């Protein structure tokens, strides 16, 4: 599924994301996954991969097998569904631990300017 910008904003609100950080989250998602829930990235230099709307990494956060594991206690395939509840819970856990530093897409594109969501 690909969200529109406002569709993403509405879904993130539904998932309980902090309104004060909403533009950061939208920017992160737009730069990491282009708002696609099922995106699997190319292999990273360290051999890991990133999954889903928030591009969550399998080195630390999700398990590649069929048994949920790692720090979010989920399988990576659970991060690829149109229902973003599991992915959102994991993304918020990552944020709580590292702020936005875990995401190069945020670091490279969102640190100083964020998208306009005032019409949403």
Swiss-Prot record:
It catalyses: Hydrolysis of (1->4)-beta-linkages between N-acetylmuramic acid and N-acetyl-D-glucosamine residues in a peptidoglycan and between N-acetyl-D-glucosamine residues in chitodextrins. Disulfide bonds join 6-120, 27-110, 62-76, 72-90. One of its GO terms (biological process) is defense response to bacterium. Keywords: Antimicrobial, Bacteriolytic enzyme, Disulfide bond, Glycosidase, Hydrolase. It comes from the Eukaryota. GO terms for molecular function: lysozyme activity. Residues 1-120 form the C-type lysozyme domain. It is an enzyme of class 3 (hydrolase). The active site is at residues 32, 50. Its EC number is 3.2.1.17. Belongs to the glycosyl hydrolase 22 family. Monomer. Lysozymes have primarily a bacteriolytic function; those in tissues and body fluids are associated with the monocyte-macrophage system and enhance the activity of immunoagents. This is Lysozyme.
